[in-house]
């Protein structure tokens, strides 16, 4: 399929499909650990990479290949590598491109496990990590060194949905020809933003979220050029992490991607109406959403994103107790971590995900006592708003 001729929705449905023996419409699940060779000579050629074909599911599987082809087409990259989680994608990538003595510049605002990998994981193996605000190009410029191998960031970032100018950042980072720009595009997805087209070298995803969209799979994906993808597959994934995605999970994601575009349209449409409600509510101090003109990254988001997404953070005036009260009185919204599901998910970081931390530690990470994170789902938006309204009345 010539994906460039088609729209995003068509690409998500049709890209990367492989013909199979029986001509099935749905992609078969090739539930096998290993593959049979016609001869010893063929086995030798495949291990020597002289002949295309499958060897062992840790190295590749037809069902997983279809998923990889689809996301590569959506992100407009040359190739992709599927992993068993978003952290598997991030770890497999970093363990491929980094070595002792290298330097990483990354953002202060990161997904918690990514932050832990940067702060406690990489540094154990002789890799230096500098944390900056990547939306401030002067900070990035001042942090970079001759041995800076990676600039890593999320945009929009968690929890305040900070926006980074990817085109400007990539241009700055590439003044060092050895530096790779890696972007976690989980929040935006290729529906809204394509970092490779804006100058990034590698894109990573937690496919658990919007791309699968149904809350029933843990998976990750890496998208980049063919050379780097091969290195990540045969070094970082095969030898370092072993974070291989199984064909059953790959099938679920392929199925989920068939509704990717229409789901994202509904997510974004619902979120705008929820933001409008929250922004006017007297018990809310502040709403973080890149679609608001008051958001510091609004103009950049308009420039590099097709839409503003379905993630919202807001601060309650009543602080810690107000956050708990709101969540404990909701009837429709689900109290759960993660995001990008059909259901609306809500969490209060101070009393949930970040409860082991002190107040000072939370605030250093941008998490105030009254901060609430909302992943707007696909329910009728009037029902989402009504549930939030009745919950807020209890504060």
From Swiss-Prot:
Enzyme Commission identifier(s): 4.4.1.11, 4.4.1.2
Known catalytic reactions: L-methionine + H2O = methanethiol + 2-oxobutanoate + NH4(+); L-homocysteine + H2O = 2-oxobutanoate + hydrogen sulfide + NH4(+) + H(+)
GO cellular-component term (any): cytoplasm
Gene3D superfamilies associated with the record: Aspartate Aminotransferase, domain 1 (3.90.1150.10), Type I PLP-dependent aspartate aminotransferase-like (Major domain) (3.40.640.10)
Cofactor(s) required for function per UniProt: pyridoxal 5'-phosphate
Keyword Lyase: yes
Principal EC category: lyase
Keyword annotations of the record: Antibiotic resistance, Lyase, Pyridoxal phosphate
Chain residues that bind substrate: 111, 373
GO molecular function: homocysteine desulfhydrase activity; methionine gamma-lyase activity; pyridoxal phosphate binding
Residues with PTM N6-(pyridoxal phosphate)lysine: 209
CDD domains to which the protein is assigned, alphabetical: CGS_like
Annotated positions binding pyridoxal 5'-phosphate: 56-58, 86-87, 206-208
InterPro entries membership: Cys/Met-Metab_PyrdxlP-dep_enz, L-Met_gamma_lys, PyrdxlP-dep_Trfase, PyrdxlP-dep_Trfase_major, PyrdxlP-dep_Trfase_small
GO biological process: response to antibiotic; transsulfuration
Pfam families: Cys_Met_Meta_PP (PF01053)
Function field: Catalyzes the alpha,gamma-elimination of L-methionine to produce methanethiol, 2-oxobutanoate and ammonia; methanethiol (methyl mercaptan) is considered to be one of the main causes of the oral malodor associated with periodontitis. Also displays homocysteine desulfhydrase activity, degrading homocysteine to produce hydrogen sulfide, 2-oxobutanoate and ammonia. L-cysteine and S-methyl-L-cysteine are poor substrates for the enzyme.
Assembly mode: Homotetramer.
Record's miscellaneous remark: F.nucleatum strain ATCC 10953 is able to grow in medium containing 1 mM 3CA.
Family membership noted in the UniProt record: Belongs to the trans-sulfuration enzymes family. L-methionine gamma-lyase subfamily.
Protein name (record): L-methionine gamma-lyase
Organism the protein comes from: Fusobacterium nucleatum subsp. polymorphum
